[in-house]
Amino acid sequence: MDEDLRERIEREAETAALFNALKHESDAQVGAILGPMMGENPDFRPHGDEIPGIISPVIERVNGLSDEEKRERLEELAPEKVEALAAEDEGDDRPLPELPNADAYDDVRMRLAPNPNGPWHVGHARMPAVIGTYKDRYDGWFCVRFDDTDPETKRPDLDAYGEILDAIDYLGFEPDEVVKASDRVETYYEYGRKLIKAGGAYTCSCDAESFSELKNNAEACPHRDKDIETTLSEFEAMIDGEYSAGEMVLRVRTDIEHKNPALRDWVAFRMVDTPHPREEAADYRCWPMLDFQSGIDDHEFGISHIIRGIDLQDSAKRQQFVYEYFDWEYPEVIHWGHVQIDAYDIEMSTSTIKQLIDDGELDDWDDPRAPTVASLKRRGIRGQAIVNAMVELGTSTSNVDLAMSSVYAENREFVDDEADRRFFVRDGVEKPLAGGPESASPPLHPNDEDRGRREIPVGDAVYVEPDDVPADGERVWLKGLGPVRHEDGAFVATDDDIEVVRDGAVDVVHWVPAQESVPLRLRTVDGDEAGHAEPGIETYDADDIVQFERIGFARIDRHDDEESVAYFAHP
Protein backbone atom coordinates (compact mmCIF):
# COMPACT_ATOMS: atom_id res chain seq x y z
CA MET A 1 0.00 0.00 0.00
CA ASP A 2 1.48 3.35 -0.99
CA GLU A 3 1.75 6.22 1.48
CA ASP A 4 -0.84 8.41 -0.25
CA LEU A 5 -3.50 5.70 0.02
CA ARG A 6 -2.61 5.06 3.64
CA GLU A 7 -3.00 8.77 4.43
CA ARG A 8 -6.40 8.83 2.69
CA ILE A 9 -7.55 5.83 4.70
CA GLU A 10 -6.43 7.44 7.96
CA ARG A 11 -8.10 10.73 7.06
CA GLU A 12 -11.39 9.05 6.09
CA ALA A 13 -11.31 6.98 9.27
CA GLU A 14 -10.62 10.02 11.44
CA THR A 15 -13.45 11.98 9.84
CA ALA A 16 -15.88 9.09 10.19
CA ALA A 17 -14.83 8.38 13.78
CA LEU A 18 -15.23 12.03 14.79
CA PHE A 19 -18.67 12.20 13.20
CA ASN A 20 -19.74 8.85 14.67
CA ALA A 21 -18.53 9.67 18.19
CA LEU A 22 -20.23 13.08 18.22
CA LYS A 23 -23.44 11.75 16.69
CA HIS A 24 -23.79 8.85 19.12
CA GLU A 25 -22.24 10.64 22.10
CA SER A 26 -20.02 7.62 22.74
CA ASP A 27 -16.75 6.11 21.62
CA ALA A 28 -16.49 5.27 17.94
CA GLN A 29 -16.18 1.57 17.10
CA VAL A 30 -14.11 0.04 14.31
CA GLY A 31 -17.06 -2.01 13.04
CA ALA A 32 -19.35 1.00 12.72
CA ILE A 33 -16.70 2.97 10.83
CA LEU A 34 -15.34 0.29 8.54
CA GLY A 35 -18.46 -0.79 6.64
CA PRO A 36 -19.61 2.64 5.43
CA MET A 37 -16.04 3.71 4.72
CA MET A 38 -15.42 0.69 2.48
CA GLY A 39 -18.78 1.20 0.78
CA GLU A 40 -18.02 4.83 -0.04
CA ASN A 41 -14.44 4.15 -1.17
CA PRO A 42 -14.32 1.11 -3.48
CA ASP A 43 -10.57 1.52 -4.00
CA PHE A 44 -10.04 0.69 -0.32
CA ARG A 45 -11.57 -2.78 -0.66
CA PRO A 46 -8.52 -4.64 -2.06
CA HIS A 47 -6.76 -3.68 1.17
CA GLY A 48 -9.57 -4.86 3.46
CA ASP A 49 -7.30 -7.13 5.50
CA GLU A 50 -4.87 -4.31 6.31
CA ILE A 51 -7.33 -1.50 6.98
CA PRO A 52 -8.57 -2.53 10.47
CA GLY A 53 -4.99 -2.38 11.74
CA ILE A 54 -4.50 1.04 10.15
CA ILE A 55 -7.66 2.66 11.45
CA SER A 56 -7.73 1.17 14.97
CA PRO A 57 -5.11 3.57 16.39
CA VAL A 58 -6.80 6.47 14.58
CA ILE A 59 -10.13 5.65 16.22
CA GLU A 60 -8.47 5.15 19.59
CA ARG A 61 -6.89 8.60 19.28
CA VAL A 62 -10.25 10.15 18.39
CA ASN A 63 -11.91 8.49 21.38
CA GLY A 64 -9.33 10.12 23.64
CA LEU A 65 -10.40 13.64 22.64
CA SER A 66 -12.95 15.75 24.47
CA ASP A 67 -16.21 16.52 22.68
CA GLU A 68 -15.02 20.08 22.08
CA GLU A 69 -11.75 18.86 20.58
CA LYS A 70 -13.62 16.39 18.39
CA ARG A 71 -15.92 19.09 17.07
CA GLU A 72 -13.00 21.45 16.36
CA ARG A 73 -11.09 18.74 14.53
CA LEU A 74 -14.15 17.73 12.50
CA GLU A 75 -14.62 21.39 11.54
CA GLU A 76 -11.08 21.35 10.14
CA LEU A 77 -11.46 18.09 8.22
CA ALA A 78 -15.07 18.22 7.02
CA PRO A 79 -17.13 21.28 7.97
CA GLU A 80 -20.12 19.86 6.08
CA LYS A 81 -20.20 17.01 8.59
CA VAL A 82 -20.58 19.50 11.43
CA GLU A 83 -23.55 20.98 9.58
CA ALA A 84 -24.98 17.48 9.15
CA LEU A 85 -24.68 16.92 12.89
CA ALA A 86 -26.69 20.05 13.54
CA ALA A 87 -29.38 18.84 11.16
CA GLU A 88 -29.56 15.35 12.66
CA ASP A 89 -32.82 14.24 14.21
CA GLU A 90 -31.74 13.96 17.82
CA GLY A 91 -34.61 11.61 18.55
CA ASP A 92 -33.24 8.64 16.66
CA ASP A 93 -29.75 8.01 15.33
CA ARG A 94 -30.12 4.29 14.74
CA PRO A 95 -29.22 2.90 11.30
CA LEU A 96 -32.69 1.40 10.85
CA PRO A 97 -35.42 4.02 10.41
CA GLU A 98 -38.71 3.73 12.22
CA LEU A 99 -41.20 1.45 10.51
CA PRO A 100 -43.87 3.44 8.66
CA ASN A 101 -47.10 3.96 10.60
CA ALA A 102 -46.00 1.56 13.33
CA ASP A 103 -48.18 3.40 15.85
CA ALA A 104 -51.29 2.62 13.78
CA TYR A 105 -51.03 -1.10 14.59
CA ASP A 106 -51.69 -2.88 17.87
CA ASP A 107 -48.62 -5.03 17.20
CA VAL A 108 -45.78 -4.91 14.73
CA ARG A 109 -46.02 -8.28 12.98
CA MET A 110 -43.48 -9.27 10.33
CA ARG A 111 -42.61 -12.37 8.40
CA LEU A 112 -39.46 -13.95 7.12
CA ALA A 113 -40.42 -15.92 4.01
CA PRO A 114 -37.50 -18.05 2.77
CA ASN A 115 -37.65 -20.43 -0.15
CA PRO A 116 -36.21 -23.68 1.27
CA ASN A 117 -34.38 -24.65 -1.91
CA GLY A 118 -31.07 -24.79 -0.06
CA PRO A 119 -29.11 -23.42 2.90
CA TRP A 120 -28.54 -19.68 3.05
CA HIS A 121 -25.76 -17.72 1.41
CA VAL A 122 -24.41 -14.68 3.25
CA GLY A 123 -26.80 -12.24 1.57
CA HIS A 124 -29.78 -14.10 3.01
CA ALA A 125 -28.72 -13.05 6.52
CA ARG A 126 -29.79 -9.45 5.89
CA MET A 127 -33.53 -10.10 6.18
CA PRO A 128 -33.52 -11.92 9.55
CA ALA A 129 -30.99 -9.41 10.88
CA VAL A 130 -33.30 -6.49 10.11
CA ILE A 131 -36.61 -8.18 10.94
CA GLY A 132 -35.22 -9.55 14.20
CA THR A 133 -33.89 -6.12 15.14
CA TYR A 134 -37.26 -4.51 14.43
CA LYS A 135 -38.98 -7.20 16.50
CA ASP A 136 -36.74 -6.36 19.45
CA ARG A 137 -37.26 -2.62 18.98
CA TYR A 138 -41.05 -2.79 18.90
CA ASP A 139 -41.48 -5.83 21.15
CA GLY A 140 -43.16 -7.27 18.08
CA TRP A 141 -43.78 -10.67 16.48
CA PHE A 142 -42.35 -12.47 13.50
CA CYS A 143 -42.86 -15.82 11.87
CA VAL A 144 -40.78 -17.91 9.53
CA ARG A 145 -43.02 -18.90 6.65
CA PHE A 146 -41.43 -21.30 4.21
CA ASP A 147 -42.73 -20.31 0.77
CA ASP A 148 -42.43 -23.82 -0.64
CA THR A 149 -45.28 -23.92 -3.16
CA ASP A 150 -43.09 -24.43 -6.24
CA PRO A 151 -42.21 -28.14 -6.37
CA GLU A 152 -40.56 -27.84 -9.76
CA THR A 153 -38.71 -24.62 -10.60
CA LYS A 154 -37.55 -23.82 -7.06
CA ARG A 155 -37.84 -27.31 -5.70
CA PRO A 156 -37.58 -27.45 -1.90
CA ASP A 157 -34.61 -29.21 -0.32
CA LEU A 158 -35.88 -31.27 2.62
CA ASP A 159 -32.74 -30.54 4.66
CA ALA A 160 -33.00 -26.80 4.05
CA TYR A 161 -35.98 -26.29 6.36
CA GLY A 162 -33.93 -27.22 9.41
CA GLU A 163 -30.75 -25.61 8.12
CA ILE A 164 -32.49 -22.26 7.65
CA LEU A 165 -33.95 -22.40 11.16
CA ASP A 166 -30.45 -23.21 12.46
CA ALA A 167 -29.11 -20.14 10.64
CA ILE A 168 -31.77 -17.91 12.22
CA ASP A 169 -30.89 -19.30 15.65
CA TYR A 170 -27.19 -18.69 14.97
CA LEU A 171 -27.98 -15.07 14.14
CA GLY A 172 -29.61 -14.77 17.54
CA PHE A 173 -33.33 -14.75 16.78
CA GLU A 174 -36.22 -17.04 17.64
CA PRO A 175 -39.37 -16.91 15.49
CA ASP A 176 -42.71 -16.79 17.25
CA GLU A 177 -44.16 -19.24 14.74
CA VAL A 178 -42.88 -21.48 11.95
CA VAL A 179 -45.17 -22.27 9.01
CA LYS A 180 -44.81 -24.27 5.80
CA ALA A 181 -46.96 -22.91 2.99
CA SER A 182 -47.19 -26.44 1.57
CA ASP A 183 -49.21 -27.34 4.68
CA ARG A 184 -51.78 -24.66 3.83
CA VAL A 185 -52.77 -25.60 0.28
CA GLU A 186 -56.39 -26.26 1.26
CA THR A 187 -56.56 -22.72 2.67
CA TYR A 188 -55.38 -21.29 -0.66
CA TYR A 189 -57.98 -23.40 -2.49
CA GLU A 190 -60.70 -21.95 -0.27
CA TYR A 191 -59.60 -18.40 -1.05
CA GLY A 192 -59.43 -19.31 -4.73
CA ARG A 193 -63.09 -20.34 -4.56
CA LYS A 194 -64.01 -17.13 -2.73
CA LEU A 195 -62.19 -15.05 -5.33
CA ILE A 196 -64.06 -16.79 -8.15
CA LYS A 197 -67.41 -16.17 -6.43
CA ALA A 198 -66.47 -12.50 -6.01
CA GLY A 199 -65.94 -12.27 -9.77
CA GLY A 200 -62.21 -11.86 -9.29
CA ALA A 201 -60.85 -14.89 -11.13
CA TYR A 202 -61.43 -17.11 -14.15
CA THR A 203 -60.00 -20.36 -15.48
CA CYS A 204 -57.98 -20.09 -18.69
CA SER A 205 -56.69 -22.78 -21.03
CA CYS A 206 -54.77 -20.46 -23.39
CA ASP A 207 -51.24 -21.60 -24.02
CA ALA A 208 -48.64 -19.27 -22.52
CA GLU A 209 -47.50 -17.83 -25.84
CA SER A 210 -51.02 -17.00 -27.04
CA PHE A 211 -52.00 -15.36 -23.76
CA SER A 212 -48.78 -13.35 -23.65
CA GLU A 213 -49.50 -11.94 -27.10
CA LEU A 214 -53.05 -10.99 -26.11
CA LYS A 215 -51.90 -9.50 -22.82
CA ASN A 216 -49.20 -7.40 -24.45
CA ASN A 217 -51.83 -6.05 -26.86
CA ALA A 218 -54.17 -5.30 -23.92
CA GLU A 219 -56.71 -7.75 -25.33
CA ALA A 220 -58.86 -10.10 -23.25
CA CYS A 221 -58.56 -13.82 -23.84
CA PRO A 222 -61.77 -15.70 -24.83
CA HIS A 223 -62.08 -17.22 -21.34
CA ARG A 224 -62.21 -13.92 -19.45
CA ASP A 225 -65.99 -13.66 -19.55
CA LYS A 226 -66.55 -17.25 -18.46
CA ASP A 227 -69.40 -17.59 -15.96
CA ILE A 228 -68.72 -18.25 -12.28
CA GLU A 229 -70.24 -21.75 -12.27
CA THR A 230 -68.04 -22.95 -15.11
CA THR A 231 -64.99 -21.37 -13.54
CA LEU A 232 -65.72 -23.03 -10.19
CA SER A 233 -66.21 -26.39 -11.88
CA GLU A 234 -62.95 -26.13 -13.80
CA PHE A 235 -61.08 -24.94 -10.71
CA GLU A 236 -62.33 -28.01 -8.82
CA ALA A 237 -61.09 -30.13 -11.71
CA MET A 238 -57.69 -28.46 -11.33
CA ILE A 239 -57.73 -29.29 -7.62
CA ASP A 240 -58.64 -32.89 -8.41
CA GLY A 241 -55.65 -33.15 -10.73
CA GLU A 242 -57.65 -33.62 -13.93
CA TYR A 243 -55.34 -31.36 -15.94
CA SER A 244 -51.65 -31.60 -16.70
CA ALA A 245 -49.11 -28.82 -16.47
CA GLY A 246 -49.87 -26.03 -18.95
CA GLU A 247 -53.44 -27.12 -19.69
CA MET A 248 -55.32 -24.87 -17.25
CA VAL A 249 -54.62 -21.95 -14.92
CA LEU A 250 -56.71 -19.72 -12.68
CA ARG A 251 -56.17 -16.03 -13.42
CA VAL A 252 -56.93 -13.00 -11.27
CA ARG A 253 -59.20 -10.64 -13.19
CA THR A 254 -57.37 -7.28 -12.98
CA ASP A 255 -57.28 -4.55 -15.62
CA ILE A 256 -56.47 -5.98 -19.04
CA GLU A 257 -55.55 -2.49 -20.22
CA HIS A 258 -53.34 -1.67 -17.25
CA LYS A 259 -50.30 0.36 -18.28
CA ASN A 260 -48.05 -2.30 -16.72
CA PRO A 261 -48.51 -5.57 -18.67
CA ALA A 262 -47.10 -7.54 -15.72
CA LEU A 263 -50.24 -6.70 -13.74
CA ARG A 264 -52.72 -7.82 -16.39
CA ASP A 265 -54.72 -10.91 -15.37
CA TRP A 266 -51.87 -12.69 -13.61
CA VAL A 267 -51.87 -16.39 -12.74
CA ALA A 268 -53.02 -17.36 -9.22
CA PHE A 269 -52.96 -21.18 -9.62
CA ARG A 270 -51.31 -23.51 -12.10
CA MET A 271 -50.83 -27.24 -12.58
CA VAL A 272 -47.51 -28.87 -11.66
CA ASP A 273 -46.85 -32.48 -12.62
CA THR A 274 -43.78 -32.88 -10.38
CA PRO A 275 -44.72 -34.13 -6.89
CA HIS A 276 -43.68 -32.05 -3.89
CA PRO A 277 -40.72 -33.61 -2.03
CA ARG A 278 -42.58 -33.40 1.30
CA GLU A 279 -44.69 -36.52 1.74
CA GLU A 280 -47.47 -34.45 3.32
CA ALA A 281 -47.82 -32.36 0.14
CA ALA A 282 -46.88 -34.90 -2.52
CA ASP A 283 -50.45 -35.52 -3.74
CA TYR A 284 -51.19 -31.91 -4.71
CA ARG A 285 -50.99 -30.99 -8.40
CA CYS A 286 -52.73 -27.60 -8.35
CA TRP A 287 -50.38 -25.09 -6.74
CA PRO A 288 -50.78 -21.38 -5.96
CA MET A 289 -48.32 -18.93 -7.44
CA LEU A 290 -46.17 -17.12 -4.89
CA ASP A 291 -47.94 -13.77 -5.24
CA PHE A 292 -51.31 -15.35 -4.44
CA GLN A 293 -50.07 -17.61 -1.65
CA SER A 294 -47.99 -14.89 -0.03
CA GLY A 295 -50.78 -12.32 -0.22
CA ILE A 296 -53.26 -14.67 1.45
CA ASP A 297 -50.81 -15.61 4.19
CA ASP A 298 -49.86 -12.01 4.94
CA HIS A 299 -53.52 -11.27 5.63
CA GLU A 300 -54.22 -14.49 7.54
CA PHE A 301 -51.26 -13.93 9.86
CA GLY A 302 -52.01 -10.26 10.40
CA ILE A 303 -48.71 -9.05 8.95
CA SER A 304 -48.34 -5.31 9.49
CA HIS A 305 -45.04 -4.66 7.69
CA ILE A 306 -43.36 -6.39 4.76
CA ILE A 307 -39.73 -5.93 3.72
CA ARG A 308 -38.90 -7.08 0.21
CA GLY A 309 -36.49 -6.31 -2.61
CA ILE A 310 -37.12 -3.31 -4.82
CA ASP A 311 -37.33 -5.68 -7.79
CA LEU A 312 -40.55 -7.10 -6.27
CA GLN A 313 -42.59 -3.90 -6.41
CA ASP A 314 -44.97 -5.54 -8.89
CA SER A 315 -45.79 -8.22 -6.31
CA ALA A 316 -47.45 -5.69 -4.03
CA LYS A 317 -49.38 -4.25 -6.97
CA ARG A 318 -50.61 -7.68 -8.05
CA GLN A 319 -51.65 -8.63 -4.54
CA GLN A 320 -53.55 -5.39 -4.07
CA PHE A 321 -56.07 -6.52 -6.70
CA VAL A 322 -56.86 -9.55 -4.52
CA TYR A 323 -57.01 -7.40 -1.40
CA GLU A 324 -59.50 -5.09 -3.09
CA TYR A 325 -61.77 -8.02 -4.00
CA PHE A 326 -61.76 -9.14 -0.37
CA ASP A 327 -61.90 -5.60 1.05
CA TRP A 328 -58.67 -6.11 3.00
CA GLU A 329 -56.08 -3.50 3.98
CA TYR A 330 -52.66 -4.05 2.50
CA PRO A 331 -49.68 -4.10 4.91
CA GLU A 332 -47.02 -1.41 4.98
CA VAL A 333 -44.21 -2.24 2.54
CA ILE A 334 -40.53 -1.33 2.68
CA HIS A 335 -38.64 -1.99 -0.54
CA TRP A 336 -34.87 -2.11 -0.33
CA GLY A 337 -32.03 -2.38 -2.80
CA HIS A 338 -29.79 -5.37 -3.33
CA VAL A 339 -26.71 -6.01 -1.23
CA GLN A 340 -23.42 -6.78 -2.91
CA ILE A 341 -20.83 -8.62 -0.84
CA ASP A 342 -17.10 -8.64 -1.48
CA ALA A 343 -14.32 -11.08 -0.53
CA TYR A 344 -15.62 -14.14 -2.40
CA ASP A 345 -14.68 -15.58 -5.78
CA ILE A 346 -17.86 -17.69 -5.83
CA GLU A 347 -21.19 -16.27 -6.98
CA MET A 348 -23.67 -15.55 -4.17
CA SER A 349 -26.22 -18.01 -5.53
CA THR A 350 -27.78 -21.07 -3.90
CA SER A 351 -27.93 -22.98 -7.19
CA THR A 352 -24.31 -22.13 -8.04
CA ILE A 353 -23.04 -23.23 -4.63
CA LYS A 354 -25.11 -26.41 -4.80
CA GLN A 355 -23.64 -27.24 -8.22
CA LEU A 356 -20.08 -26.68 -6.96
CA ILE A 357 -20.75 -29.07 -4.08
CA ASP A 358 -22.24 -31.67 -6.42
CA ASP A 359 -19.18 -31.32 -8.69
CA GLY A 360 -16.79 -31.78 -5.77
CA GLU A 361 -15.39 -28.25 -6.08
CA LEU A 362 -16.61 -27.46 -2.55
CA ASP A 363 -16.73 -29.91 0.36
CA ASP A 364 -20.12 -28.83 1.66
CA TRP A 365 -22.17 -25.76 2.55
CA ASP A 366 -19.80 -24.94 5.41
CA ASP A 367 -16.66 -25.10 3.27
CA PRO A 368 -14.66 -21.97 4.23
CA ARG A 369 -14.51 -20.96 0.56
CA ALA A 370 -18.31 -20.93 0.29
CA PRO A 371 -20.14 -17.59 0.73
CA THR A 372 -22.66 -19.15 3.13
CA VAL A 373 -23.96 -18.54 6.62
CA ALA A 374 -22.91 -22.08 7.58
CA SER A 375 -19.36 -21.31 6.48
CA LEU A 376 -19.19 -18.15 8.59
CA LYS A 377 -20.42 -20.10 11.60
CA ARG A 378 -17.81 -22.82 11.13
CA ARG A 379 -15.12 -20.18 10.76
CA GLY A 380 -16.00 -18.83 14.20
CA ILE A 381 -17.80 -15.65 13.19
CA ARG A 382 -20.36 -14.69 15.82
CA GLY A 383 -23.89 -14.36 14.51
CA GLN A 384 -24.27 -10.99 16.21
CA ALA A 385 -21.31 -9.65 14.21
CA ILE A 386 -23.17 -10.44 10.98
CA VAL A 387 -26.36 -8.88 12.34
CA ASN A 388 -24.57 -5.68 13.36
CA ALA A 389 -22.95 -5.30 9.95
CA MET A 390 -26.20 -6.01 8.09
CA VAL A 391 -28.21 -3.58 10.22
CA GLU A 392 -25.68 -0.84 9.48
CA LEU A 393 -26.69 -1.09 5.80
CA GLY A 394 -30.15 0.27 6.64
CA THR A 395 -33.19 -0.19 4.41
CA SER A 396 -32.48 2.21 1.56
CA THR A 397 -33.93 1.58 -1.89
CA SER A 398 -30.40 2.01 -3.25
CA ASN A 399 -28.16 -0.98 -3.78
CA VAL A 400 -25.60 -1.27 -1.00
CA ASP A 401 -22.19 -2.87 -0.60
CA LEU A 402 -21.22 -4.99 2.38
CA ALA A 403 -17.49 -5.23 2.94
CA MET A 404 -16.79 -8.49 4.76
CA SER A 405 -14.08 -6.58 6.59
CA SER A 406 -16.89 -4.78 8.44
CA VAL A 407 -18.25 -8.16 9.61
CA TYR A 408 -14.73 -9.08 10.68
CA ALA A 409 -14.32 -5.81 12.57
CA GLU A 410 -17.59 -6.45 14.41
CA ASN A 411 -16.49 -9.99 15.22
CA ARG A 412 -13.13 -8.78 16.49
CA GLU A 413 -15.00 -6.82 19.16
CA PHE A 414 -16.49 -10.10 20.42
CA VAL A 415 -13.49 -12.45 20.24
CA ASP A 416 -10.41 -10.32 20.83
CA ASP A 417 -10.57 -10.44 24.62
CA GLU A 418 -11.38 -14.14 24.88
CA ALA A 419 -8.92 -15.51 22.31
CA ASP A 420 -5.63 -16.89 23.57
CA ARG A 421 -2.62 -16.03 21.45
CA ARG A 422 -0.71 -18.87 19.81
CA PHE A 423 1.94 -19.29 17.13
CA PHE A 424 1.26 -21.02 13.82
CA VAL A 425 3.86 -21.19 11.06
CA ARG A 426 2.68 -21.79 7.50
CA ASP A 427 4.88 -23.76 5.11
CA GLY A 428 7.68 -23.50 7.66
CA VAL A 429 11.39 -23.36 6.92
CA GLU A 430 13.40 -25.30 9.50
CA LYS A 431 16.38 -23.44 10.94
CA PRO A 432 18.86 -24.90 13.43
CA LEU A 433 19.11 -22.68 16.51
CA ALA A 434 22.24 -22.17 18.57
CA GLY A 435 22.26 -20.43 21.93
CA GLY A 436 19.48 -18.61 23.69
CA PRO A 437 16.99 -19.80 26.31
CA GLU A 438 15.76 -23.40 26.42
CA SER A 439 12.14 -22.24 26.51
CA ALA A 440 10.00 -19.23 25.77
CA SER A 441 7.05 -17.94 27.78
CA PRO A 442 5.02 -15.41 25.79
CA PRO A 443 1.72 -14.24 27.35
CA LEU A 444 -1.53 -15.99 26.53
CA HIS A 445 -3.00 -12.52 25.99
CA PRO A 446 -1.00 -9.28 25.72
CA ASN A 447 -3.65 -7.28 27.59
CA ASP A 448 -4.38 -9.82 30.32
CA GLU A 449 -1.33 -10.80 32.35
CA ASP A 450 -3.58 -12.57 34.87
CA ARG A 451 -4.35 -15.18 32.22
CA GLY A 452 -0.77 -16.36 32.47
CA ARG A 453 1.83 -17.46 29.98
CA ARG A 454 2.40 -20.47 27.83
CA GLU A 455 5.66 -22.40 28.02
CA ILE A 456 7.17 -23.28 24.65
CA PRO A 457 10.20 -25.61 24.63
CA VAL A 458 12.71 -24.46 22.05
CA GLY A 459 14.88 -27.45 21.22
CA ASP A 460 17.71 -27.17 18.71
CA ALA A 461 15.69 -26.02 15.67
CA VAL A 462 12.68 -23.83 14.87
CA TYR A 463 10.23 -23.32 12.02
CA VAL A 464 9.67 -19.83 10.62
CA GLU A 465 7.67 -18.70 7.61
CA PRO A 466 9.61 -18.37 4.34
CA ASP A 467 9.06 -14.60 4.11
CA ASP A 468 10.40 -14.17 7.65
CA VAL A 469 13.82 -15.70 6.97
CA PRO A 470 16.29 -12.78 6.93
CA ALA A 471 19.15 -12.47 4.52
CA ASP A 472 22.41 -14.07 5.60
CA GLY A 473 23.99 -11.93 8.29
CA GLU A 474 20.75 -10.13 9.15
CA ARG A 475 18.76 -10.40 12.39
CA VAL A 476 15.19 -11.11 13.43
CA TRP A 477 13.54 -11.17 16.82
CA LEU A 478 11.82 -14.48 17.59
CA LYS A 479 8.74 -13.32 19.45
CA GLY A 480 8.80 -14.25 23.13
CA LEU A 481 12.28 -15.75 22.76
CA GLY A 482 14.79 -13.15 21.62
CA PRO A 483 17.08 -11.93 18.84
CA VAL A 484 18.91 -14.21 16.43
CA ARG A 485 21.23 -13.70 13.49
CA HIS A 486 20.97 -15.74 10.30
CA GLU A 487 24.40 -17.27 9.71
CA ASP A 488 25.21 -20.02 7.21
CA GLY A 489 21.64 -21.34 7.13
CA ALA A 490 21.18 -21.38 10.91
CA PHE A 491 19.95 -19.00 13.61
CA VAL A 492 22.43 -17.92 16.25
CA ALA A 493 21.23 -16.10 19.38
CA THR A 494 22.58 -12.57 19.90
CA ASP A 495 22.65 -10.28 22.93
CA ASP A 496 20.74 -7.38 21.34
CA ASP A 497 18.16 -5.71 23.55
CA ILE A 498 14.60 -4.72 22.65
CA GLU A 499 15.71 -1.29 21.47
CA VAL A 500 16.66 -2.79 18.09
CA VAL A 501 12.99 -3.63 17.62
CA ARG A 502 11.77 -0.25 18.82
CA ASP A 503 14.21 1.47 16.48
CA GLY A 504 12.87 -0.55 13.55
CA ALA A 505 16.20 -2.22 12.89
CA VAL A 506 14.91 -5.73 13.54
CA ASP A 507 11.57 -7.32 12.65
CA VAL A 508 9.63 -9.42 15.14
CA VAL A 509 8.53 -12.79 13.75
CA HIS A 510 6.65 -15.77 15.13
CA TRP A 511 8.06 -19.28 15.24
CA VAL A 512 7.46 -22.79 16.57
CA PRO A 513 9.87 -25.48 17.78
CA ALA A 514 10.67 -27.96 15.04
CA GLN A 515 10.65 -31.01 17.31
CA GLU A 516 7.56 -30.48 19.47
CA SER A 517 5.28 -28.48 17.19
CA VAL A 518 1.86 -29.80 16.18
CA PRO A 519 0.96 -30.27 12.49
CA LEU A 520 -2.06 -28.09 11.77
CA ARG A 521 -4.13 -27.40 8.68
CA LEU A 522 -5.70 -23.96 8.51
CA ARG A 523 -8.77 -23.87 6.25
CA THR A 524 -9.28 -20.43 4.69
CA VAL A 525 -11.39 -18.63 2.09
CA ASP A 526 -8.46 -19.00 -0.31
CA GLY A 527 -7.81 -22.67 0.36
CA ASP A 528 -6.04 -24.83 2.93
CA GLU A 529 -2.67 -23.88 4.41
CA ALA A 530 -0.51 -26.55 6.02
CA GLY A 531 1.89 -25.73 8.81
CA HIS A 532 2.86 -26.28 12.42
CA ALA A 533 1.41 -24.81 15.60
CA GLU A 534 3.11 -24.46 18.94
CA PRO A 535 2.61 -27.32 21.42
CA GLY A 536 -0.52 -26.88 23.49
CA ILE A 537 -2.81 -26.17 20.55
CA GLU A 538 -4.12 -29.73 20.92
CA THR A 539 -5.55 -28.88 24.36
CA TYR A 540 -8.21 -26.58 22.92
CA ASP A 541 -11.71 -27.88 22.36
CA ALA A 542 -13.74 -27.64 19.16
CA ASP A 543 -15.29 -24.15 18.82
CA ASP A 544 -12.57 -22.48 20.91
CA ILE A 545 -11.24 -19.31 19.30
CA VAL A 546 -7.52 -18.54 19.23
CA GLN A 547 -5.51 -15.83 17.56
CA PHE A 548 -2.57 -17.05 15.56
CA GLU A 549 -0.19 -14.15 16.03
CA ARG A 550 0.52 -12.12 12.89
CA ILE A 551 -2.08 -14.21 11.01
CA GLY A 552 -5.48 -13.80 12.60
CA PHE A 553 -8.31 -15.40 14.52
CA ALA A 554 -9.29 -19.01 13.97
CA ARG A 555 -11.81 -21.49 15.31
CA ILE A 556 -10.48 -24.85 16.44
CA ASP A 557 -12.41 -27.49 14.52
CA ARG A 558 -10.95 -30.85 15.52
CA HIS A 559 -7.83 -32.83 16.40
CA ASP A 560 -7.14 -35.83 14.19
CA ASP A 561 -4.42 -38.43 14.68
CA GLU A 562 -2.16 -36.82 12.09
CA GLU A 563 -3.03 -33.14 12.45
CA SER A 564 -5.19 -30.53 14.10
CA VAL A 565 -7.62 -28.56 11.94
CA ALA A 566 -8.66 -24.94 12.41
CA TYR A 567 -10.85 -22.62 10.34
CA PHE A 568 -9.58 -19.12 9.66
CA ALA A 569 -12.00 -16.40 10.72
CA HIS A 570 -10.27 -13.15 9.77
CA PRO A 571 -7.18 -11.03 10.49
From Swiss-Prot:
Catalytic activity from the UniProt record: tRNA(Glu) + L-glutamate + ATP = L-glutamyl-tRNA(Glu) + AMP + diphosphate
GO cellular component: cytosol
Motif 'HIGH' region location, chain numbering: 114-124
GO biological process: amide biosynthetic process; glutamyl-tRNA aminoacylation
Annotated InterPro entries: Gln/Glu-tRNA_Ligase, Glu-tRNA-synth_arc/euk, Glu/Gln-tRNA-synth, Glu/Gln-tRNA-synth_Ib_cat-dom, Glu/Gln-tRNA-synth_Ib_codon-bd, Rbsml_bL25/Gln-tRNA_synth_N, Ribosomal_bL25/Gln-tRNA_synth, Rossmann-like_a/b/a_fold
Entry-linked Pfam families: tRNA-synt_1c, tRNA-synt_1c_C, tRNA-synt_1c_C2
UniProt xrefs under NCBIfam families: gltX_arch, PRK04156.1
Designated name of the protein: Glutamate--tRNA ligase
